[in-house]
Swiss-Prot record:
GO cellular component: extracellular region
Name of the protein in its database record: Probable rhamnogalacturonase B
Keyword Zinc-finger: no
Keywords on record: Carbohydrate metabolism, Cell wall biogenesis/degradation, Disulfide bond, Glycoprotein, Glycosidase, Hydrolase, Polysaccharide degradation, Secreted, Signal
The encoding gene: rhgB
EC number assigned by the record: 3.2.1.171
Cellular compartment(s): Secreted
Enzyme class: hydrolase
UniProt source species: Aspergillus niger (strain ATCC MYA-4892 / CBS 513.88 / FGSC A1513)
Broad class of the protein's primary localization: secreted
Region of interest (Disordered), residue spans: 503-558
Task of the protein: Pectinolytic enzymes consist of four classes of enzymes: pectine lyase, polygalacturonase, pectin methylesterase and rhamnogalacturonase. Hydrolyzes alpha-D-galacturonopyranosyl-(1,2)-alpha-L-rhamnopyranosyl linkages in the backbone of the hairy regions of pectins.
Residues that carry a glycan: 145, 239, 254, 321
Signal sequence, start to end: 1-21
Length: 558
C-alpha cells in the first residue's frame, strides 16, 4: 500500500547527515519520492499489469516508466507479478520506482531482469519493506546452469538510492552497481543459493554508501570491483555467505579510498578477501575496521596469487596503505586456514599495511598460523622495511589464544544454508545488521512519525569526525489523483549491453579502468578484494564474471 506520512518523511528524504569522510560528497536522490509522486504517479495496473503471477509485467512496467520518466513515480502495488520479458528503463530523471509487490521470474533469457540506466535523481524502494524480486534460480541450478539472468543492475545512475527491498534466489548475480555515482543502498535483504557465482552486491562506481544489508549466498557478500573510488560499506551482515571482499583484480586496476566498517560475518568463506593473480594497477587507501567473525574458513585473506582465477599478464596489482583494525572473533580451523594471510605479488610487493587490535582464535584445535609474502608494514608477520623487495612466504604458528578475541554473535545466525536446487523463501529485512549498532534509517514499514524523528537524530550523530554529506532516508509517497493512459512498450529482441568492470580472466574480458577525478575532502583508507575460498574451495568457478551480456532476448525497454 502507499503510505500516508508525507510531511515527516518528505522532510526526512532531504535531511542532511554526517557520514564518514570516505565519501566525497552527497549521496541519494535530490528530491523525495513524495514530491515525485505528487508530480505524477504511473500505476502499472493502469497499463495492463495484473497481480495474478502469470501476466507479464514487462510491457506494463516499461509503459508506466515512459509516462513518468521525466518526473514522477512508477508504482507496482502489493500482489504477485510475473516477469517474462526483462525491463530496461533508460534515461529517467527525477523519478522513483516503488515496488510493493513481489516480482517472480517466469522468463528464461539471460541479461538483467530490471536494468536501470542513464538516470539521475532516482529512488527504488518498497513502502512496506516487503517488496521483492524472486528469481527462482533453483530452476536453473537444478540443471547445473549458473548463467541465467541477474535480478537488478544499475548503470550510469547518479544521485540515487535503493532501499527497503528484497532480492531472492537469482539465477546469477543479485545486484550490480555499474559506473554509478552518489548512491545509497540500505535496508535490504539478499538471499541466494549456496553456490559460487551468485553474488550479493557488486560495486564498481564512485561515491557510494552501502549500509544495513544482509546477504546469504556462497559468493560475494558486498564486493568492490575496479574501477572504484570513495566507497563506504558499513553495517553488513554476511549470514552464511561467501564474505566481503575486493576483486578479482586484473589489468589496469584502479581502486582507492575504500572503507569497510562494522562487518559481521558468520559461517562464510572469509571475512575479507582481496584477490588477484597477476595484473596491473593499484589498490590504495583502504580501511577495514570493526569486523566480527565466527565459523568462517578464512578471516583476513589477501591473496595476489588467487588460484580460482587464471593468471593475468602483469607483475601484479600494487596494494598500499591498507589498515586492518579492531577484528574480533573466531575462525573455523586456524591450523588449516590461519586468520592472517597477506600474500602479495613478488613483482609488486605491498607496503604500508597495518594490522592492529586484531584478535582471532580457532574454534577447532589449539593452534593457528599467520602467513605473509612480499608484504611490508606493521603487525604479525609483516616485515618492517623501507626496501620493498620480494620475499618468500614466512609463517608463524601460535598455540595460545590472544587476549580479547571473544565477540558476540547475532541471534539471527542461520543454522544451515538454503541449498541451490530447491525454492528459497522470501525473508524479511532485519532490523539489526551488526552487534550493538542501530541502523541509520528505520524500515519504511516501521517509520511512523516517532521512528522517523529518531532516525533524524541518529543521522545527525553518525561519525563525529566525518564530513557532512546529504543522504536519502525513507520517504513515504502517495499517488496523484490522475492516472495517465497506457502507452505502448517497445520490446527488443537484442539490447545493447553496458560495459563490464575490469576484472581477472575468470570474470570476463578485462576492460581499461577510467581514472576518476580526485574528489575534495576525500579521506584516506585501505581497501581489499572479495571472493570465496575455503570450505572445500568450492563454487567459485568463473564467478560468472560480468561476462556475456550480449543478445539479451526479450527485453522491454524505452
Amino acid at each position: 500500500m502507499l503510505l500516508d506520512k508525507l510531511s515527516v518523511l518528505s522532510f526526512l528524504g532531504l535531511a542532511p547527515i554526517f557520514a564518514a569522510a570516505q565519501l566525497s560528497g552527497s549521496v541519494g536522490p535530490l528530491t523525495s519520492a513524495s514530491t515525485k509522486a505528487a508530480t505524477k504517479t504511473c500505476n502499472v495496473l493502469d497499463y495492463g499489469a495484473k497481480a495474478d503471477k502469470s501476466t507479464d509485467l514487462g510491457a506494463p512496467l516499461a509503459s508506466a516508466f515512459a509516462d513518468c520518466k521525466s518526473g514522477g513515480l512508477v508504482y507496482v502495488p502489493s500482489g504477485d507479478y510475473a516477469l517474462s520479458t526483462w525491463a530496461r528503463l533508460s534515461g529517467g530523471e527525477a523519478w522513483a520506482l516503488q515496488i510493493d509487490g513481489i516480482i517472480y521470474r517466469t522468463g528464461t533469457d539471460g541479461g538483467n531482469m530490471i536494468y536501470i540506466e542513464h538516470s539521475s535523481d532516482f529512488e527504488l524502494f518498497s513502502s512496506t519493506s516487503e517488496g521483492a524480486m524472486q528469481g527462482l534460480g533453483y530452476e536453473f541450478h537444478a540443471d547445473d546452469n549458473w548463467s541465467g539472468p541477474r535480478l537488478l543492475r544499475l548503470y550510469e545512475v547518479t544521485d540515487f538510492s535503493v532501499h527497503d527491498f528484497i532480492l531472492v534466489d537469482s539465477p546469477s548475480f543479485h545486484f550490480s552497481l555499474d559506473t554509478c555515482t552518489n548512491g545509497e543502498i540500505y535496508n535490504m535483504a539478499i538471499r541466494g543459493g549456496n553456490h559460487g557465482g551468485l553474488d550479493g552486491i557488486d560495486v564498481w562506481s564512485n561515491n557510494i554508501w552501502v549500509h544495513d544489508v544482509e546477504v546469504t549466498n556462497k559468493d560475494e557478500c558486498v564486493t568492490v570491483k575496479s574501477p572504484s573510488k570513495n566507497i563506504l560499506i558499513e553495517s553488513i551482515y554476511c549470514n552464511w555467505s561467501g564474505g566481503c571482499g575486493m576483486g578479482s583484480f586484473g589489468s589496469d586496476t584502479n581502486v582507492s579510498d575504500i572503507t569497510y566498517r562494522n562487518i559481521y560475518t558468520w559461517s562464510s568463506n572469509n571475512m575479507m578477501l582481496i584477490k588477484s593473480n597477476g595484473g596491473s594497477g593499484f589498490v590504495e587507501n583502504v580501511l577495514l575496521e570493526n569486523f566480527i567473525g565466527h565459523g568462517n574458513a578464512y578471516s583476513l585473506d589477501i591473496d595476489s596469487y588467487w588460484a580460482s582465477m587464471s593468471a593475468v599478464d602483469g607483475d601484479g596489482v600494487q596494494l598500499s596503505n591498507i589498515t586492518v583494525k579492531n577484528w574480533k572473533g573466531t575462525e573455523a580451523y586456524g591450523a588449516e586456514r590461519g586468520p592472517v594471510k597477506v600474500v602479495c605479488a613478488d613483482g609488486a610487493p605491498c607496503y604500508d599495511i597495518t594490522i592492529e587490535d586484531f584478535a582471532m582464535w580457532t574454534e577447532e584445535g589449539d593452534s593457528q598460523w599467520y602467513s605473509c609474502e612480499s608484504a611490508y608494514g606493521s603487525g604479525y608477520c609483516l616485515q618492517d622495511s623501507d626496501d620493498h623487495v620480494s620475499y618468500s612466504v614466512t609463517t608463524s604458528t601460535v598455540s595460545s589464544a590472544p587476549s580479547g578475541y571473544s565477540a558476540t554473535s547475532m541471534a539471527a545466525d542461520l543454522t544451515t544454508d538454503f541449498g541451490s536446487t530447491v525454492s528459497i523463501p522470501i525473508p524479511t529485512i532485519p532490523t539489526s545488521f551488526y552487534p550493538g549498532a542501530t541502523p541509520y534509517s528505520a524500515l519504511m514499514a516501521n517509520s511512523a512519525s516517532t521512528a522517523a524523528a529518531s532516525s533524524i537524530a541518529s543521522h545527525a550523530t553518525v561519525h563525529s569526525s566525518s564530513a557532512s554529506v546529504a543522504a536519502s532516508v525513507p520517504s513515504a509517497v502517495a499517488p496523484s489523483e490522475s492516472i495517465p493512459a497506457a502507452t505502448s512498450a517497445v520490446v527488443s529482441s537484442a539490447a545493447a549491453i553496458a560495459p563490464s568492470p575490469a576484472v581477472g580472466a575468470q570474470e570476463g574480458s578485462t576492460t581499461s579502468a577510467p581514472s576518476f577525478a580526485a574528489p575534495s575532502g576525500a579521506g584516506n583508507s585501505p581497501q581489499g578484494p572479495t571472493g570465496a575460498s575455503g570450505f572445500g574451495e568450492k563454487g567459485q568457478q568463473g564467478e560468472q564474471g560480468e561476462q556475456g551480456e550480449q543478445g539479451e532476448q526479450g527485453v522491454c525497454y524505452v
